[in-house]
A protein has these predicted regions:
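Short, solvent-exposed turn/loop segments enriched in Gly/Ser/Thr/Pro and often Arg
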Residues: 37-40, 52-76, 83, 119-132, ...
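Cleavable N-terminal signal peptides
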Residues: 6-7, 17, 57
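Classical eukaryotic N-terminal signal peptides for Sec-dependent ER targeting/secretion
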Residues: 1-9
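Active-site-proximal cap/lid insertion segments
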Residues: 29-38, 148-174, 184-194, 198-342, ...
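Active-site segment of extracytoplasmic enzymes that catalyze sulfate/phosphate-ester chemistry
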Residues: 24-27, 31-118, 129, 149-150, ...
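Loop/turn elements at helix/coil->beta-strand transitions in domains of secreted/extracellular proteins
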Residues: 19-23, 49-55, 66, 79, ...
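C-terminal cap/loop subdomain of S1 sulfatases and analogous C-terminal strand-loop tails that border
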Residues: 140-143, 148, 299-305, 341-346, ...
Length: 454
């Protein structure tokens, strides 16, 4: 009799009476440090101001394909081995397909909890290309509208459940709007009987920075944010790559930075429209109150900081600090300062669905997120295949050049003064020990709190 009672109780836990819907909005290259959220007024009203803001959310890898892999699988880069945006670097290669892709949050929700799953927009940079094996529908997704290749706004192809559909350069072809319409049509036919997981991945604010025609020149005259680090590296204390370019930048470069900054903002206006339409569609179907909406980005972006013109990839706040907002059932309007990571998305989505599974992150729905958590941010560089040349020195080789950087954000929020070499030897050793352990961590070892855990 005892066994029957226990079995019945477990069934009640595993199959909630009314499972929650999940909408993940994953934008591209959206910074938080350079006011990237400012154009998203409707998003702020409908999501940010109605839920929880995670003010210290960081990309596990400050570049598109690897961090999207981390979001999908809950794994740090050293565990999923997507190293960069190239096929040789693991982006949508066969190892990804045979391994990590078979353990995304979509598969768990779809196979274990009966979620109807929907994906529209950018997946992985090399997805659908001939070199990566062509079009396909990745496992775990019922409705698939994946962008072929990297971010575009016009003249692109979508893989619709594995069949190619080409789009042109007319206003109705604008990718963010196309994603919005597929999503709205999907929501219209949903019922409370079957929960759904929806991922919307528009191209904004990634290059080539093409706004929808209705948003052209909406921010005419806007200039790139002149942070204290903009076009400035007085100390010359950053790693070698950051010191390669001319500083200050040539005068002719600054107007180009201003133009791209403005157009990035203008691309986000269509995202803002999309968010408002999704919100309204959920409300009209009377399922908004039963739906979690998550808004985040794959990485940040710099525009002129430390004299580096445009990109991500760097270990500075502009590139690694990303927006993360969640609204939904039981989510109060609040701000959480505890450090969180892209790898937490997997555990969070599973938690919403009533599931648990191994990952390198933790659910953000927990009430005891620690302010003392240490996060790992790793990037192995373009053209890296993860295999060391036999003649390449290792970190135990005294001839290896290495760079140590540390910053006091209380006194130096723009990372102008590197304290890495002035740090006491014991403190530097503790940080180094933490790093060496984190780069080989797996599962709950990665969510270590405080120095005693390392």
């Amino acid at each position: 009799m005892e066994n029957r009672i226990v079995f019945f109780l477990l069934c009640c836990v595993a199959y909630p009476v009314m499972a929650k819907n999940i909408v993940l909005i994953l934008v591209d290259d959206l910074d938080i440090e350079l006011d990237g959220m400012k154009p998203l007024i409707q998003t702020q009203n409908l999501i940010v101001n109605k839920g929880t803001s995670f003010t210290n959310c960081y990309a596990a890898v400050p570049i598109c394909c690897p961090n999207r892999a981390s979001i999908l699988t809950g794994r740090y880069q050293h565990n999923h081995w997507v190293l960069n945006n190239s096929i040789s670097g693991g982006c949508n290669d066969q190892k990804w397909k045979d391994g990590p892709e078979k353990n995304t949050f979509a598969i768990h929700l779809n196979k274990k909890m009966g979620y109807r799953t929907f994906y529209a927009g950018k997946y992985l940079n090399q997805y659908g290309t001939r070199a990566a094996g062509g079009l396909r529908k990745p496992p775990g997704w019922d409705y698939w509208y994946g962008l072929v290749g990297n971010s575009k706004y016009y003249n692109y192809s979508l893989s619709i459940n594995g069949t190619e559909r080409k789009y042109g350069n007319q206003p109705q072809d604008y990718l963010t709007d196309v994603i919005k319409q597929y999503a709205v049509d999907f929501i219209k036919v949903q019922t409370n009987n079957t929960p759904f997981l929806m991922v919307l991945a528009p191209p904004a604010a990634h290059a080539p920075f093409n706004p929808a025609s209705r948003h052209n020149d909406k921010y005419k005259g806007t200039k790139a944010k002149r942070t204290a680090s903009f076009n400035n590296m007085e100390e010359r204390d950053k790693h070698w790559l950051a010191r390669m370019g001319p500083i200050p930048l040539p005068d002719g470069v600054l107007p180009k930075l201003d133009d791209i900054y403005r157009r990035r903002w203008e691309t986000l206006l269509a995202v803002d429209d999309m968010v408002a339409n999704i919100h309204q569609s959920l409300k009209l179907k009377n399922i908004l109150d039963n739906t979690y909406i998550i808004f985040t980005s794959d990485n940040g972006y710099h525009v002129g900081q430390f004299g580096m013109p445009l990109d991500k990839r760097q270990p500075y706040e502009t590139d690694i600090h990303i927006p993360l907002y969640i609204r939904g059932p039981g989510i109060e309007q609040s701000k959480i300062a505890a450090p969180v990571s892209s790898v937490d998305m997997f555990a969070t989505i599973l938690d919403i669905a009533g599931l648990e599974y191994f990952s390198d992150g933790t659910s953000l729905l927990k009430h005891n997120l620690s302010i003392d958590r240490t996060l790992l941010i790793e990037y192995k560089g373009e053209n890296s295949e993860g295999r060391s040349n036999s003649g390449c020195p290792t970190d135990s080789d005294p001839n290896l050049a290495s760079y140590v950087e540390a910053y006091d954000f209380t006194q130096d929020p723009y990372q102008l003064k590197n304290l890495g070499y002035a740090m006491k030897r014991g403190m530097r050793h503790r940080f180094r020990r933490r790093l060496k352990n984190l780069v080989k961590c797996k599962d709950d070892q990665c969510v270590a709190i405080g120095p005693d855990r390392y």
